[in-house]
């Protein structure tokens, strides 16, 4: 169960996004959409879900290494998160099985869709935490949703088109 103090997360997240928009004016529009969406959320107080092996094996070290505002924000809510391994529909496909074994995500803000409940409800925005274990490769993909990723710890190797880039803690990545 979250305490009332944890509700500061939304205000802190909005302040963080506002600072990022000032730092990188090219991302003013998607960050503005995030800030606007965070302005109309409702606290949910869900029961924590079961843990997963990747979370048990890697979350502690990832949090210990997390730095900057993204790390602070994550540490403030992590105890209430419920984690899930995605892409059950791809079970039996070797590359997706390898991904799922070392990857989990947890909704923080989002819709109440009958699956795992986020900590705050919003029908306008989804924000969550992603935990990707060492040497896990997330396959190339294309989708309609624009995504903002903040690297809290570790190193993210990111591909956009044919170009690869490497991002460390504190980096904001816009995936569109």
Regions found by a protein language model. Give the residues of each.
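A short, N-terminal "cap"/entry segment at the start of jelly-roll beta-barrel domains
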Residues: 3, 7-122
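Conserved short histidine dyad/triad with adjacent acidic residue
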Residues: 105-116, 125-143, 163-164, 176
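Short acidic-glycine-tyrosine-enriched beta hairpin
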Residues: 124, 148-150, 161-176
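Hydrophobic/aromatic beta-strand elements that line small-molecule binding cavities or substrate pockets
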Residues: 130, 156, 171
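Short beta-strand segments in beta-sandwich/barrel cores
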Residues: 137-138, 147, 154-159
């Amino acid at each position: 169960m979250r305490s009332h103090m944890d509700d500061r997360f939304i205000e802190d997240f909005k302040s963080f996004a506002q600072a990022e928009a000032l730092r990188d004016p090219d991302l003013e529009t998607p960050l503005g959409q995030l800030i606007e969406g965070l302005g109309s959320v409702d606290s949910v107080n869900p029961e924590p879900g079961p843990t997963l092996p990747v979370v048990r094996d890697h979350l502690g070290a990832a949090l210990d290494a997390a730095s900057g505002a993204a790390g602070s924000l994550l540490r403030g809510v992590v105890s209430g998160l419920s984690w899930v391994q995605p892409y059950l529909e791809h079970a039996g496909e070797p590359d997706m099985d390898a991904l799922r074994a070392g990857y989990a995500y947890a909704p923080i803000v989002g819709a109440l869709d009958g699956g795992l409940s986020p900590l705050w409800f919003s029908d306008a925005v989804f924000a969550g935490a992603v935990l990707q274990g060492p040497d896990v490769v997330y396959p190339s993909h294309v989708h309609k949703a624009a995504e903002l990723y903040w690297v809290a710890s570790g190193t993210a190797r990111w591909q956009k088109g044919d170009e690869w880039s490497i991002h460390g803690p504190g980096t904001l990545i816009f995936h569109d």
